[in-house]
Amino acid sequence: VWLFAVASVCALTACSDNDTENPEGEKTGGENGKPTPETVEFINSNLVYWGDEDGVGTDHFVLTLYTDMEVDAAGNPIGPGKIMAFSLNVPPFASGTTEFPLPEGTFDAAPNGYTFNEWTFNLGYMNQMDLPTGKVEVPAGSFYGDVKAHSTSVDADLLSGGKMTVKRSADGEYTISGVLVGDLSLKRYFTYTGKLTTIDRHGSTEEIPNSTLNADLTLNEWAQAR
């Protein structure tokens, strides 16, 4: 079950009327005319632990970060807002472990869609889903998404490069940040600070959606597969 904070949309980094975005996803008008990166500050999170459900030798987390958005009755965030999903490969937890916090580390892009090395994030891809209304494609793996204003529809950028860092303080608070690049060749600067509560799905035989976000008909039923 996914819970979303019902609150007003938080303010993101603003720019003057003269600021324009350059091809790297940065904004001009910074100090000495240098591009000023626009960093998305996420405030909501959801973390699911799947274990080594694919038998590839690494454990699998799905981390999803959101900006502050209202939600509809079905739990779908209503834009405008932003979302990032991360499919993460980590060293296996020891046998008998009962708690599964996201480990600290630096994650690089996996070299391809078939390699699941430790400390990598899996590349984004489109996954075809069969629904009563027909076949639709939804983003899977790691991706960035813009949630359209007054809508639950999401425009996704499939992530394929960059680096992200996960740090955890003594009191259990996380700081997650990085710069990732996707199919649109834009640099996605982001940060998140807050708690992460792990939802343990490893060993589950039931396929459970990773989110209830909709893109027109569906971004719900995001795939469990890496």
Segments (PLM) and residue ranges:
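Bacterial Sec-dependent N-terminal signal peptides
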Residues: 10-46, 202-222
